[in-house]
Amino acid sequence: MGCYHFHLNQLSRGKGQSAVASAAYRAGAKMRSTYYGEWNDYTRKGGVILAEIHLPKHAPERFKDRETLWNEVEWMEGNKKAQLAHSFDIALMNEFSMEENMKLARRFVEEQLVARGMIADLAIHNPKTGMNVW
């Protein structure tokens, strides 16, 4: 039986956190925060094997672009103590193939978040290079 790990965090500007920087890290991407005027480059981080945006039907298609989505969140939540997002860190099952784990992750995101009108930015990291985080 695999190790069970399910952790929920709040991403908060009050803690000095940036939604754009966090999304860039999880996706292993380079993104510019227009709110803070800085670049966040995690392209050399490696280990990201899946990074995709899941939108509910009512969400604008432009939010399929990670940088657009998270910059809009930064600007819409202007309060200095704003809660910008929630992050789920979940261990994948060692007994399942990566394809099976991806299918389970997508199902969780679609059924528990997107079906309730939320946008989900899903990232899966290679277990050989670090934690399984999505």
What do the predicted segments below correspond to?
Residues 1-134:
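N-terminal nicking endonuclease/strand-transfer module with a His-rich metal-binding environment
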